UniProtKB/Swiss-Prot annotation:
Residue stretches making up the EngB-type G domain: 36-224
Keyword Coiled coil carried by entry: no
Gene this protein is translated from: engB
Binding residues annotated for Mg(2+), in chain numbering: 51, 71
Family: Belongs to the TRAFAC class TrmE-Era-EngA-EngB-Septin-like GTPase superfamily. EngB GTPase family.
Name by which UniProt lists this protein: Probable GTP-binding protein EngB
Origin species: Methanococcus maripaludis (strain DSM 14266 / JCM 13030 / NBRC 101832 / S2 / LL)
Function comment: Necessary for normal cell division and for the maintenance of normal septation.
Length: 230
């Protein structure tokens, strides 16, 4: 009796292909779901405490250094409900040529532009004391420091940055409000700074001061972001 073995083989091949297609579709769905998670970017001039912040938030053993330029690549951390993105430090970096510094700046800009629709929150960390000093020094030369360039860049993309004013232990307690007023005004926010609590967080990273406030603002931004996508 003649058996149609070719037909059976074809059926097996079709079933195998269907299984492969289902696996591929499942893979695509998984990847799509991961890609759809909101991103929280962290940026700042080298040596402002960015790596310390990432270490505190992630619990990971992030390398923390005293010299500028510890973080030289874009690193993503899986936080479950969102992805934390540690961007390289910008500005002066000891031992790094100016050409390389410009390349890092370009990489940051390209990453943010390419992912702006997925960014739920942007954290811009500043050194409380040196930020004002740098702005004044560059201003005297008629130039705009990279700190303000990046702040304006985030505003242009409507990413509504959260400015973490770190190393507030360098400022006398009695002068905190006046100093933060100056920082906020320099960044284009009309004083007093306390009317912009969603945008400014005074912090002392090494003492874990301000971390809870930052996390609260991140979660708030993520919730708003998710609602906007529904």
């Amino acid at each position: 009796m003649y058996e149609n073995t070719n037909s059976e083989e074809n059926n097996n091949n079709i079933q195998s292909q269907n299984m492969d297609i289902q696996k591929f579709k499942k893979y695509i769905r998984t990847e799509k779901k991961a890609d759809e998670r909101p991103k929280v970017i962290v940026m700042g001039r080298s040596n402002v405490g960015k790596s310390t912040f990432v270490k505190l938030v992630t619990g990971k053993n992030v390398r923390v250094g005293k010299k500028p330029g510890v973080t030289l690549k874009i690193t993503e951390y899986d936080m479950g409900t969102y992805i934390l993105v540690d961007l390289p430090g910008f500005g002066f970096m000891e031992g790094i040529e100016k050409k390389a510094q410009e390349k890092i700046k370009d990489e940051i800009i390209h990453y943010v532009e390419d992912n702006k629709d997925a960014i739920a929150a942007s954290i811009h960390i500043l050194d409380a004391k040196s930020f004002i000093d740098i702005v004044e020094r560059w201003g005297n030369k008629g130039e705009v420091p990279i700190d303000l360039e990046m702040a304006d860049f985030l505003e242009e993309l409507e990413l509504n940055p959260i400015f973490v004013v770190n190393k507030m232990d360098k400022i006398k307690n009695s002068e905190w409000d006046n100093h933060l007023d100056k920082v906020s005004e320099t960044l284009g926010f009309l004083p007093p700074w306390r009317q912009w609590l969603d945008n400014f967080v005074p912090a002392i990273m090494r003492d874990n001061y301000g971390i809870d406030g930052i996390k609260h603002r991140i979660n708030k931004r993520i919730n708003i972001f998710k609602k906007s996508k529904k």
